[in-house]
Amino acid sequence: MYHQNLISSTPNQNSNPHDWDIQNPLFSIHPSAEIPSKYPFMGITSCPNTNVFEEFQYKITNDQNFPTTYNTPFPVISEGISYNMHDVQENTMCGYTAHNQGLIIGCHEPVLVHAVVESQQFNVPQSEDINLVSQSERVTEDKVMFKTDHKKKDIIGKGQWTPTEDELLVRMVKSKGTKNWTSIAKMFQGRVGKQCRERWHNHLRPNIKKNDWSEEEDQILIEVHKIVGNKWTEIAKRLPGRSENIVKNHWNATKRRLHSVRTKRSDAFSPRNNALENYIRSITINNNALMNREVDSITANSEIDSTRCENIVDEVMNLNLHATTSVYVPEQAVLTWGYDFTKCYEPMDDTWMLMNGWN
C-alpha cells in the first residue's frame, strides 16, 4: 500500500520525471537511466544525484555520460553497523519513498548535518594510509633510538689495550705531550681522554717502576699514610716511579693476603718481617677495637636511657613496667577505739595521695 498523500514533496514513482521540475523547480532533476537498488526488497526507488545543489557543492556534472550516484541504502555489515559515506552519497534534496511495511520515508535533511550526525553515531574507520604513516614513524623513531644507544655504547671501550694501541699512544704523547688527552683520544676508536691518561701514567711512562716493592718504599708508604690516610695521589708524589694506581693496588694486595691468611687459621698474629703487613694488621686491629668500643658505648647509652625512662615513669605513676613484678600496696592497719566504732589507719605517701586526689 502506498501513502503518497502524506508527504506532498515525495514524488510518485509512476509519475513522469518531468513533473518533478514542477514540484521542485529550483532543484530540477534530469531524467537518466534507472539503476536498480542494491536492496530491492525494501522498495526504494533510485534517482540520480545530479541536481543543481549537488552540482554546486560536489562539482558533479549533469552530463549523462558521467557516472551518477543513486540513492541506495548504506551498506550494512554482519554486525548491523553502517559503513561510512565513501561510496554512496545521500540525495537529501530529492525525496524517495521506501515501501517497507507501509512506511514512507522522506529525505529532506541538509547534507552537512546528515554527515555530521552519521559520523557521530557510528565509528568511522581510520584510513589505512594514516595508520601506515604512524607505524612507519614509530619504526623510524625506534631505529634512531637504537642507533643512538649503540653509538653511546661504542664511545667508551672497556676492553684491554692492545700493543698497537700502546705504540700509538706513546707516539702521540711524544708529539702532543701529556696535557692534551682529548686531542690524543681522537686518534683512538672507542677511547676517551681519561683512559689514555691513566694508561700512560700507570703503565707506559718511561720512569715507571714495575718491579717489587722495597722495604724503603714500604716504610715511606707507612709514614705518609699515617699523615694523609688513603690519599693515594699524595702518597704517589712521595714515591718516584710509583703511580697512584700502583700504590693503591699494592696496599689492597697486602690486605687481601692478610685476610686470606686469617681465613686459613694460620699464625695470623705472629710477627712478620714485612713492615707494611704489620702496619696494616695493627690498623685493622685498632679499627676493630675502636668499632667494638663504639658499639658497646652506644648499647650502654641506650640501656641507661631506657632505665632512666623506666625510673621516671615509676616515680610518677608508682608502677613498675617490668612484667615479672607486681604493684605493692601497703596493708591496712586496723585499730579499735572502742566497741562502738572502728577506725582504719592506712599509711600512704604523698604520691599515693596525689594520685587519688586526696588533700
Swiss-Prot record:
Entry's Gene Ontology molecular function annotations: DNA binding; DNA-binding transcription factor activity; sequence-specific DNA binding
Protein name, as recorded: Transcription factor MYB115
SMART domains: SANT (SM00717)
Upregulation: Induced by LEC2 but repressed by MYB118.
Gene source species: Arabidopsis thaliana (Mouse-ear cress)
CC terms in the record's Gene Ontology section: nucleus
Taxonomic superkingdom: Eukaryota
Function: Transcription activator that recognizes the motif 5'-TAACGG-3' in the promoter of target genes. Promotes vegetative-to-embryonic transition and the formation of somatic embryos from root explants in a WUS-independent manner. Together with MYB118, activates the transcription of S-ACP-DES2/AAD2 and S-ACP-DES3/AAD3 thus promoting the biosynthesis of omega-7 monounsaturated fatty acid in seed endosperm.
Statement: the UniProt record of this protein carries the keyword Lipid biosynthesis: no
